[in-house]
Amino acid sequence: DVAIDMPAGPSEVEVLADETANPIFVAADLLSQAEHGVDSQAILITTSVELQQAVKVEVERQLALLPRKEIAEKSLANSKLIVVDSMAEAIELTNAYAPEHLIIETEDYLSVAERIVNAGSVFLGSLTPESAGDYASGTNHTLPTNGYAKAYSGVSLDSFIRKITFQEIKPEGLNIIGPAIELMAANEQLDAHKNAVSVRLGQLENGNGN
């Protein structure tokens, strides 16, 4: 058996958009995720009622043209087109959802991106579709789903590297951090932890650091 960090899937995309977004692009982004599987989820969060309505119409138009229409149609049953009152609310909802893929199609997408703390992979601007991340832009598309982006990152080289830490404390260093270690150990009532430092500090005070 091989341990893994988490199950990946079902797949998700969220488009975070304002009134400047192109509904044709947004609909295409939602459908590109919906065709993955019947349990995929595609979410639009927008501050614009007009955009929401335009995207709804465009999704129906593009859906009718897809070879995987039946799959995408079932996926859309799990999906939502959400209108919020402000961009601040949209960002708060996004961070709570922690989408696997997040596409930001707003006028000030860079400043919006700075406020995103939970997402697997973020696609910036109207010309950056999620499918670019799947195939060509170089980012890994094995990403946390189902809210796990709050705690995990996507697969990277770090995922396959085993790391060992090494530390050495010199006399000056022990004199600096030793009292803090003693205080913390005493607070946890771990006297042996404290003593491991205290005996060394005592030796240093007596001029014997060995």
Task: Name every feature range the model reports, one short phrase each.
Residues D1-Q41:
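Conserved NAD(P)+-binding/catalytic subdomain of aldehyde/semialdehyde dehydrogenases
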Residues A3, S40-I45, L65-S75, E105-T106, ...:
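Flexible, glycine/charged-enriched surface loops at secondary-structure junctions
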Residues I4-M6, V15, V26, V83-V84, ...:
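General beta-strand structural signal in soluble alpha/beta enzymes
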Residues M6-E12, V38-I45, V49-V57, P67, ...:
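Gly/Ser/Thr-rich active-site loops/lids in small-molecule metabolic enzymes
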Residues P7, T20-A28, I45, V49-Q53, ...:
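Electropositive phosphate-/nucleotide-binding environments in soluble metabolic enzymes
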Residues H36, L44-A119:
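A glycine- and small/hydrophobic-rich beta-loop-beta segment
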Residues N95-G209:
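C-terminal core of ALDH-fold dehydrogenases
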